[in-house]
């Protein structure tokens, strides 16, 4: 966990600095970074509370099925969770896309928050699928593998921030978010399938 916190800190330091290298003023760079990290992302992550509750309820049954060697039950649970995460994420993608301006104005009086909420709402399915599958992997005793995937995801995002944001600005950071979440989702999906059929 310490490595994840360190990676997150590095990312938080890099984003304003690379935005300044792109040509933004220090004040504008901090304003954009603060809007994304302090306003937009918490709104995107809020529905994940419901997924987290479902994950906590799943852990005992997954661990029990794993101990009993019930691979079929584990596979069904994995598929059900992935489908639930996809549907749940798509619902909130639509909500955030259609109501982004209203949410930004109503909650924070920030049109910039609404703009980034519309740009980032497509991450919702990926975040919910990967979150639920990571919980299943924890139940299967694969915490180290989940940590490794998380570190790789952070490394991809940091690398893209360093290389692309100075040249393409905030759009490059949004792409880094998308690419890293796609990688995370695919990695944990492959890992869960491999673990279930091992």
Model-derived segments and their meaning:
Residues 3, 29-51, 84:
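Alpha-helical transmembrane segments of polytopic membrane transporters and translocases
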Residues 37, 70-87, 91-99, 117:
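Interfacial transmembrane-helix starts/ends
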Residues 12, 134, 163, 178-198:
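C-terminal transmembrane helix end/exit motif
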Residues 45-68:
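Helix-loop junctions and terminal segments of transmembrane helices
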Residues 141-144, 154-186:
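Membrane-interface helix-loop junctions in multi-pass transport and translocation proteins
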Residues 91-109, 167:
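Short membrane-interface helical motifs at transmembrane helix boundaries
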Residues 122-149:
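Membrane-interface junctions at transmembrane-helix termini in multi-pass inner-membrane proteins
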Residues 68, 110, 139-140, 167:
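Helix-loop interface residues and adjacent transmembrane-helix termini in multi-pass membrane transporters
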